[in-house]
């Protein structure tokens, strides 16, 4: 049987967990085997920049960062489950990637 590997990524871990709960609910309603959500390592993007706009004075720096959280879900690829999965309302700041594997 085919499996669907769902990879979620976003900057807000609460919205990722909310979508994972929706996927878990779909798996329970349709009776499909689900593994996960597996939290993957968080990627931390740091951008250092000078506070002073003109370059004069002491070298003081601001450090801006963005954290990208990821989750991985394995789901048996049942047609009913995948149709319901496509109807989930995904926020703009969450990236969802579905790969079918045999």
Curated annotation (Swiss-Prot):
One molecular function GO term is: tRNA binding
The answer to keyword Ribosomal protein applying to this record is yes
UniProt keyword terms in alphabetical order: Ribonucleoprotein, Ribosomal protein
Gene Ontology cellular-component terms for this entry are: small ribosomal subunit
Q: Which InterPro entries match?
A: Ribosomal_uS10 (IPR001848), Ribosomal_uS10_CS (IPR018268), Ribosomal_uS10_dom (IPR027486), Ribosomal_uS10_dom_sf (IPR036838), Ribosomal_uS10_euk/arc (IPR005729)
Record keyword Glycoprotein present: no
Q: Which GO terms describe its biological process?
A: translation
Highest taxon above the source species: Archaea
Q: What does this protein do?
A: Involved in the binding of tRNA to the ribosomes.
Q: Which HAMAP family does the entry mention?
A: Ribosomal_uS10
- What family is this protein classified in? Belongs to the universal ribosomal protein uS10 family.
What quaternary arrangement does the UniProt entry report?
A: Part of the 30S ribosomal subunit.
Q: What's the protein here called? A: Small ribosomal subunit protein uS10
Give the organism, scientific name: Methanothrix thermoacetophila (strain DSM 6194 / JCM 14653 / NBRC 101360 / PT) (Methanosaeta thermophila)
